[in-house]
Amino acid sequence: MVISMKSEKPLVGIIMGSDSDLPVMKEAARILEEFGVPYEITIISAHRTPERAYEYAKKAEERGIEVIIAGAGGAAHLPGIIASLTVLPVIGVPIKSKALNGLDSLLSIVQMPSGIPVATVAIDNAKNAALLALRILGIKYPEIKEKLRRYMKDMKRKVEEKAKRLEEMGWERYLSE
């Protein structure tokens, strides 16, 4: 199986059902890059390439993958299929669809049968999927946990700065800048 490799020894697998999902899923890759966590990224269709999905799930752990982020739209079976084939944590990213604005994708991923868990983030929220993957990895890798602490502190600082500006300027001036 040929996989687009960001690293020779990836810890996270980012997979998606179609290349049309890439504009959403790239946000997971960006976060992992920001944190210096190696990953791989590829396309696997649960419906069009089920053998590829099977092979990916079965071999992910032996390749060193520790968490899988799976994005899919519409019927969105990819995260569930992968979760049914591996003991690795799978994080599902529902991709917004034209027909139902992603509600179909969300429900397909959330409504897994007992015994086949898939952690699910908000529609099109690959960024949170990557942050959740980092929290999972942080259990084993203290340096990732420390980077997450700094990331959260930085978020807090930015919000506090914005709050101070708004309070000083008033809402009309704040919005006009």
UniProtKB/Swiss-Prot annotation:
Substrate binds at S18, D21, R48. Gene3D superfamilies: 3.40.50.1970. GO terms for molecular function: 5-(carboxyamino)imidazole ribonucleotide mutase activity. GO terms for biological process: 'de novo' IMP biosynthetic process. Belongs to the AIR carboxylase family. Class I subfamily. It holds the Pfam family AIRC. It comes from Pyrococcus horikoshii (strain ATCC 700860 / DSM 12428 / JCM 9974 / NBRC 100139 / OT-3). Catalyzes the conversion of N5-carboxyaminoimidazole ribonucleotide (N5-CAIR) to 4-carboxy-5-aminoimidazole ribonucleotide (CAIR). This is N5-carboxyaminoimidazole ribonucleotide mutase.
